[in-house]
Structure formats: structure tokens, C-alpha cells
């Protein structure tokens, strides 16, 4: 691996006036540095000429006359393995690509001999980002001087604010319990299942949507918008390391030919519409855990963002809206981290909440102090939320063979050649894993997993995954692995829910429940006569498709085609209702394995005998 050592000579140039205009705004006090690259090969390193950006870099420079050494590692977990982007042509055509992102230019880092330091840097065109040194936050960005390597280093407090009014989160009701009860949350008696859930690393696959206002704000330049969002996600990823939560960008959509929903200055209205669009549209196109709308809309009052509380993994409510309220990407990332915190069960901090800084991430007033720490209250609330709700989607982690870039110890992703990876030595809190080598500590059999307890394999027969319902089986540890075995189900065709259905791949598919899922809690299955539409072979009634052609149902199969329901709402009189969307025509069909008659189930659009179906 080629390692780049860059020495920055710190000739502090004379100021060209009392202030300077940078991307971040007008800065009144700054230092000018001029990076000079010096390459060196470390012992054992292998040069990889196909890489444009090195995996590991060091920068040596001075701040206030004091020398510092900044160590950087490429953030290998910034993008998911199946990352994709979508934008729209002027005539509305959807354009989706899978850009190569493994050789990207976004880094995390630390300052040598400063245990509390951190950094998030873009090295795409010079150095742009922030680093924390001796408890103070500094920003660095290239100066736009022709044929020059000059950069500016400055502190947030030296930036002139265009809008001095503090920005707020739009969440109004926190229902925070007392300081005493917050402390007690960490003393809860946990079941083995809850403890295993807490010990398992979490992975949030985030989708970002940039609206048409953002597209226009940044000169209709897709490259500029991508770079901004990559920077924000790099910071978000860094922030959530504190919870051992890995945040990866799985999808980016830019509404380049107009917004897909109506946007309103009332943040709650925009969030409601965005969540519904997410469930109706985006969830059908891209598998992900959480969606954040980055908008150019100026919300009413001081509101800079709004997110649902305690809703991670929900198809509609695992979402938030964030205003692009500041030129500094770091502050926009803090707002997004705040709203994502709401999705993860955190509410606003009260006066008794502390994080060792002037302001914490979950303060109702968004921090401009450069702090990205979570308070003791936020940590306990997140812990309690995870214990009580155990959202399952964030347990799905990438396979070590799915990670296409070279392995790097310390990025919290277990890759080929590693036993474990608990993050950098400064973040690692796992006694079973050596953070410096990504190998198990002496005597340890495992570092994490549902069947790992205190660094040892759990004894054989210990339940690691309880039965979810009557069609599922409890799964047991083998005593030979830290991983819970593959999910095992009851046999297909076993009666369930008081003979209203038959088990199918671990669930009990029943028409009534499918209607409730599509039309709400009052919905019921429509009268038998409605299902006769399935004999027509049209959009609103068919059993299956062959070569794109809709095949009508035979008379005995009509209950295995389009699902007909009645939502039971007083204002609706149509007794034959269906769910139909041209983007996903098969959504709203009767699920496979659903009971269609006594002793019969739907398989491939036919109502067949349950004893021969499987």
C-alpha cells in the first residue's frame, strides 16, 4: 500500500485585508498554509497504481505556531456496496447509475498525541473539512488562488454569521423523563435477547434526497451537489461512531426536473408528504433503512429540520427533513445527525443533560459551537429505544466479501483477513478485539455476534433468535460459532391463526392482514363478487404475467390475483378497492401462500391443494 506523507510548510502569509471570503462565508481571522507533498513507502507497503486516493495519509503542519500531525484513513464504510444514484432528465426520464465509489476521497482522522481529537476531511481538491485539536474545532479549505496550494485554517467563531437567529429543531414534545429516571435506564435488567441486540454492531443504510431547490441553489451542477452530500455523510458517519453505529450512504436521488412532492414552509407538512412518498415510491425502488430530505426550503420561523421520534425501519416514518441552512457543511451535518437521532429514539436535551461541551447534538437549538457529542441523556434514551423496540433493519450488515475496497483495520467493518473490527483505538470499547490489529485478544473466541458472550461462544442450545410467531422456530446457538444459525421456520402448509391461514416461509399470510397493511386498520377483505374482476386480464384484475402480458384468472383462481379490499371509511362507498401503482404493478396482488379456500393456497397465481403446493 502506498502511504503519502505530506508536509505542510506553514509560512503564514500576510492578510490581504481584515477578512476573506471563503466557501464558508466571510472569515475575519485565519492562517494561510501551503501544503507540499512528500511521498514515502512504509516497510511492507504495496503500491497500488490504480488508486487515485491513498488509503492512509499523514499531514504535518502547525496551528498557532504549534506542530501537529494529522493521521487520515479513507472512510471505507462511507458507501454501501450497492450504492446508486438517480437524477432526472429535463423531460422527466429517470436516470439511475451505479458510480464507482470505492476509490473516493473522503477521510476520517485524528491528531497525533491528542486522544480527544478527530477529523473529517475531503481530499478531492486540496483539503476541505474540519479537525478537532485540544478541544477546539478548526476548519480548513483551499484558497481559490490560481496556481497555488494555499489553504486557510480558521475557527468557527471567526466566521461572520449572515443570520444571527439560532436555528431550532421542529420537534415540539419531548416527554423527557427526570434526571433520576434517565440514570436508572442504564441499570435495567435485560433479557439475553436484549443484551445480544445491544452488543451487535448496528448498520444504518441511509438514502438522501436533494430537492429541486437544492438543484437550483447549486447551479444545477450534479457534481457539486454530490460532493456536498458526500461531505455531510462523511461527517454523519463519524458522529455516530460514538454509538457503535455505522452509517452508510446507499442511495442518492436529486430531483433535477422538479420536486416529486409539494414542499411547504411548514416543516411538519413537508415531512408528512415526504414520508408518504418514501413508503409509496422510494421503498419500492431501493432497499434502505432511513431517508433524509435535504431541502432548500426556508422553513417557518427558526426551524432547520424535523424528524419522527423512535421510528427507525418504519417504511413511512423512518425519515426526516433537513434545511440546507448554512454554507458550512459541518453544521448541516449536525442538523442531520440531530434528526437521525430523533429517528433513533432520542428527544431534546434538558438542562440536566451533559456532554462535556457547551452544547450537545440533541439540544433543541442546533449547535454552532462545533460540538458533535451526544449527551448522557441521549445515550440512555437511544439505549432504551434499542432495548424496547429492537429495530431489525439496522442489524443487517454487509458481508466481508461484499466490501470491494482493500481491507483497513479500524473502519468498524470486518473484512477479509480480520477477526473483528471495533473501530480505531480511540473509539473501540470491545475487550475481545485488539483495535490495533483487528485480531481477537488472547483467550477470546469471538468479539461480537448473537452467540458471543464475554468473548466466548455461547453454549450449544442457547436461544439466539426467538420465534417471532407460530410460523417461526426459535433458533439455537451451535456452541461452535458467534453467529446465530440461519433462520428456521415451521413447515410450509401448517395451519396458523386459528386456521385462517397456512404457514409460508415463516409467516402466516392472511388476506385481512394484507388489506390492513394497504388500507389501514379498519380494512376488511372485499366481497367475493369483487374478485371476479381478476378474470378480465387487465391492470385491475389478473392472476399472473407472462412476457409482460396479464393473464386472466381461471374461475377457481380468482382469489389468487389482485387483492380486493374495503377500507370501511364512511366517506368511501366503493366496496371493491385495490392498491395499484404503475411503477410496481405487482404490489397489491394476493401474497404467495395465502389461503384461497379451505385446504388450498395461492401459488404462482393458482389456487392449489396445500398438501401438494410445497
From Swiss-Prot:
Motif D/ECD-tripeptide: positions: 470-472
Q: Glycosylated residues? A: 268, 376, 498
Give start-end of the signal peptide.
1-19
Comment on bound cofactor: Binds 1 zinc ion per subunit.
Q: Name one GO molecular function term.
A: toxin activity
Domain Disintegrin, by residue range, is 406-492
Q: Which residues form the propeptide?
A: 20-193
Q: Does the keyword ATP-binding apply?
A: no
Start and end of every Peptidase M12B domain?
202-398
* Location of this chain's protein in the cell: Secreted
Arranged from A to Z, the UniProt key words for this protein are: Apoptosis, Calcium, Cell adhesion impairing toxin, Disulfide bond, Fibrinogenolytic toxin, Glycoprotein, Hemostasis impairing toxin, Hydrolase, Metal-binding, Metalloprotease, Protease, Pyrrolidone carboxylic acid, Secreted, Signal, Toxin, Zinc, Zymogen
Where Pyrrolidone carboxylic acid occurs along the chain?
194
Q: Which family does it belong to?
A: Belongs to the venom metalloproteinase (M12B) family. P-III subfamily. P-IIIc sub-subfamily.
What is known about what this protein does? This metalloproteinase hydrolyzes azocasein, and oxidized insulin B-chain. Also hydrolyzes the alpha-chain (FGA) and more slowly the beta-chain of fibrinogen (FGB), without affecting the gamma-chain. Does not cleave fibrin. Inhibits endothelial cell adhesion to extracellular matrix proteins such as fibrinogen, fibronectin, vitronectin, collagen I, and collagen IV. Induces apoptosis in vascular endothelial cells.
Name the UniProt record assigns to this protein: Zinc metalloproteinase-disintegrin-like Eoc1
Give the source lineage, highest ranks first. Answer: Eukaryota, Metazoa, Chordata, Craniata, Vertebrata
